[in-house]
Amino acid sequence: MSNHRSNFRDYQREGIRANNAGTSGDAVRQNGNPISVAKHVDGKKSVYMLFLRQIGQKKFLTEQGHRYNQNDQADKDIMTRYYHGMCPDLKQKFEREVAEHNGNRGLVIKTKHQRAQRNREMRHRNPDEFQQLRRAHLETLSQTPSVIALPRDINHVLHITEDLDAFCLANRKKAKRIMTSYIAQRSDDPGNPLLCEDYTMQIVSVFPVAYAFKPSINKLSSYPAEISVTTFNLKNGIIQNESRFVKFDAAWFYPDADDIGHEELSRKAMADELGISPNGPADGCEPYEVFEWLQHLLKQHPKSPILCDRAQFNFVYYGIKTLATYTGINAITFFQEVIIPSILSIQDFTSVILEKAPTDVPRVWRDVDICNQFQYHFLIPRTELNLFCSFHENKPSPTKYNCVKAHNARLLDNFFTVIKGNRLQGFVISPPVHEICIQDGSDTSLPQTILARTISRNDAEVYAARQRDTDEQYDVHQEGPSNHDQYEFASEPLDFEEDSDEENYNEQLDVPYSYNDHFISSSSVREPEHPSARSRDVAPNVQQESVVVPAPRRLSPQRAPRPSQNSPNAYSERKSFSAFPSEDPSEDYETPIISHIMNRNEADQYFNILDSVKPGQKYKIIKFDDF
């Protein structure tokens, strides 16, 4: 009986998706499809699977001369091309069929039971093949590093161009629903409800002193130098316009002293654009003070959308994230629960207004026309409206116009230009309230918007491949590389089942698994850890029932190990796990204080799963790109 339970626990790894490997070609069903080792089945249909079964496999066999192999990357690329080239009418037919099926809960449950029963029958009908597959699967897992995979929201990784587009699209749809509801609630009021004085919006701009993507840890590092918040409405224009400089805490931002010199050229390039020192502004405020100021302004208008320039979206997003991380746990919570759901590019918000609000033109501007207008940079903010900070007011061009207050003014001027060009009902242009900048197309010194660049998914895949090649040069029994950034990625492919849905298809065929779902940061994370020892928004004597999931980290020669008592929230009664299989790891490695904090029950659950699956094995504990 105990042996049966032990075997049963081997199948209970669906909670740890990283341990879900693919299937072997030796064990197949009677129809030629592989038998999956995964227990989970889904009763829903997907457009891709309908296409694959009804059209894709036959077309592939006819044109390529052999059967489609889902484990062959070349075959997957060809099938992806077939799928995207599908006839629109046929795709709509599949979509209707999928919507009709998935919308019927009873039918979904019935299909799920039927598929589970079929899988059980196949396993009992071919017990030898299935046991062979299971043994091969367990052998593969035993040869790879085991991983505790904590869930992470992909929305927190926006340096990938495709992920940023998806994030902006999701928040745009949310803003559209909110505006539709607002207009419906004010339908009995006379005039355009968007022209009320209580309908306010806020623009936030950030210019960083340090901004760089680090492929080794799959993170964007952005430390703000200046931040500005502009509150306005459609009737009165600018209501409030403030900015702050941020003190550059190099010791906190660069845990290793060598990094300061490595990124000096990058910081100098960014600082020169803003006219400040690479070591940050001389009279900047403390980062936690700036975040508290920002939080105060945003709380004054809790229902207002938070707008920013799409071209500098990551300047704003990661800059505020850095301030929240520096400030403390409550600041992180405010960032996650208030700022992330509300932040939206001003270009997308303008499109939402033109789509939902009444206009006096037969056809409103398209998205591309709106984006082109916001790229117009031959604008000089009016001096009498206090649209420059005191530092940049007397600076020469082009440094003067990189001031974040001036950038907000130029964004707002283009916003009103679009509203005026589409003749929003009830909107009356009133200079200088709605014409806050002077157009001067002859001034070639006016700078264009500095872009917060992102990387495509293909480039990210290349970086990951390079890192994996570097990792393979070092054996785990050796002391390890001299540069601790060379221990980075750990992931396993998902099991692509016959009945998987379209989302799993996208993970398998369109993008690498490690970038789409569980892209893992290694122990050598050099993004600033949360300064819990000096947290500004948490009482220092508060003790929390928590367990730290440690991650191995190479000691910097300039620093001694930090004692665990330095962090009030970081303690554990378990023995630290090592990334190295030897019983006596090198003394050059330490366990960092802060990694990923779970409550004790959740931590015990993960450790119990690991102990039951592979008792006595050493595990490499890692964490995701999250707070």
UniProtKB/Swiss-Prot annotation:
Domain of life: Eukaryota
Reported phenotype of the disruption mutant: Insensitive to RNAi-mediated gene silencing.
Any single Gene Ontology cellular-component annotation: RNAi effector complex
Keyword terms of this UniProt record: Repressor, RNA-mediated gene silencing, Translation regulation
Keyword Repressor in annotation: yes
InterPro entries, per the entry: Maelstrom
Biased composition (Basic and acidic residues): 7-16, 467-478, 526-537
Region entry Disordered, spans: 1-31, 467-487, 523-589
Transmembrane segments: none
GO terms, biological process: regulation of miRNA-mediated gene silencing; regulation of translation; regulatory ncRNA-mediated gene silencing
Function: In complex with rde-11, required in the endogenous and exogenous siRNA pathway for biogenesis and accumulation of secondary small interfering RNA (siRNA) intermediates, such as 22G-siRNAs derived from ergo-1 targets.
Quaternary structure, from the entry: Interacts with rde-11 (via RING-type zinc finger domain). Interacts with ergo-1.
UniProt similarity note: Belongs to the maelstrom family.
Protein name: RNA interference defective protein 10
Species: Caenorhabditis elegans
